[in-house]
């Protein structure tokens, strides 16, 4: 494999100005999204105080567990559950 000499990159004033404008735009979007999240959390906490939970009564964690198929409740360790229904 042939090795190339490194290419020289020059940073121009226009490039830095463009970077700053894009950075400010992204920060403003993030700030707006955070404000919406804070307002959403406030309204959902008000709803949970009044209604006793979210709209379907499930927490975020429960919704995630349901989506991925995780069953956090252990099975009871009783004899029929351990050995099945054995009849002699």
Curated annotation (Swiss-Prot):
The keyword Metal-binding does not apply. It is found in: Nucleus. Pathway: Protein modification; protein ubiquitination. GO terms for biological process: anaphase-promoting complex-dependent catabolic process; cell division; mitotic cell cycle; protein branched polyubiquitination; protein K11-linked ubiquitination; protein K48-linked ubiquitination; regulation of mitotic cell cycle. Keywords: Cell cycle, Cell division, Coiled coil, Mitosis, Nucleus, Ubl conjugation pathway. Residues 7-37 form a coiled coil. It comes from the Eukaryota. Residues 17-36, 69-88 are annotated as: Disordered. Its main location: nucleus. Residues 78-88 have a biased composition (Polar residues). It holds the Pfam family ANAPC_CDC26. One of its GO terms (cellular component) is anaphase-promoting complex. InterPro entries: APC_suCDC26 (IPR018860). PANTHER family: ANAPHASE-PROMOTING COMPLEX SUBUNIT CDC26 (PTHR28579:SF1). The APC/C is composed of at least 12 subunits. Belongs to the CDC26 family. Component of the anaphase promoting complex/cyclosome (APC/C), a cell cycle-regulated E3 ubiquitin ligase that controls progression through mitosis and the G1 phase of the cell cycle. The APC/C complex acts by mediating ubiquitination and subsequent degradation of target proteins: it mainly mediates the formation of 'Lys-11'-linked polyubiquitin chains and, to a lower extent, the formation of 'Lys-48'- and 'Lys-63'-linked polyubiquitin chains. The APC/C complex catalyzes assembly of branched 'Lys-11'-/'Lys-48'-linked branched ubiquitin chains on target proteins. This is Anaphase-promoting complex subunit CDC26. It comes from Danio rerio (Zebrafish). The lineage of its organism: Eukaryota, Metazoa, Chordata, Craniata, Vertebrata. The gene is cdc26.
């Amino acid at each position: 494999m042939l090795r190339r000499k490194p290419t020289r990159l020059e940073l121009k004033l226009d490039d830095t100005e463009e970077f700053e404008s894009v950075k400010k735009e992204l920060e403003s979007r993030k700030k707006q999204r955070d404000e919406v999240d804070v307002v959403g959390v406030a309204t959902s906490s008000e709803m949970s105080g009044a209604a006793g939970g979210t709209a379907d009564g499930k927490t975020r964690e429960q919704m995630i567990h349901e989506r991925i198929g995780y069953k956090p409740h252990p099975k009871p360790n009783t004899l029929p559950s351990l050995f099945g229904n054995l009849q002699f």
